[in-house]
Amino acid sequence: CHYKFDKFIEEVKSGMSVIINALPAEYFAKDHVPNSFNLYYKTIAKMSVKELGEWFSEVIKLHYPKLATYIQNNKLQIYEIPIVTYCAHDKCNASELAIKELMKKGFVNINEYSGGIVEYRKMIPVDK
């Protein structure tokens, strides 16, 4: 599923979806959506299912208290967590490749914000 800007912002604010920037770390360091986490698609490909599950578990434990509660109460498994990926812009395919890699590892609830950081910054400029 491809999210439009408004739906993406809704997901970011909800605290109920893990927001993943699928670009290399140097691009993430230059600019990223607040409250998103860098997980380059090539890194996902190299991680084992166990490592990826542990990575998401740690991020959720530290930054997503609502999701952590659902997991603790067995209402949600780690591989069912809502994830939204994004990359640079609508011509970039890193977020799509991240989705494919996540699905190969058993994650089932993944969406994409295809506008990427370029569209995001058009809508929400950086304060100078």
Residue ranges: model-predicted function:
Residues 122-128:
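Active-site neighborhoods of enzymes that stabilize oxyanions during catalysis
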Residues 3, 44-47, 115:
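Short coil/turn linker and secondary-structure boundary residues
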Residues 55-120:
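Catalytic cysteine-centered active loop of the rhodanese-like fold, especially the PTP/DSP P-loop
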Residues 1-33, 128:
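Flexible, polar/low-complexity N-terminal or interdomain linker segments that lie immediately upstream
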Residues 18, 22-51, 55-56:
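Mid-length scaffold segments of soluble, non-membrane domains
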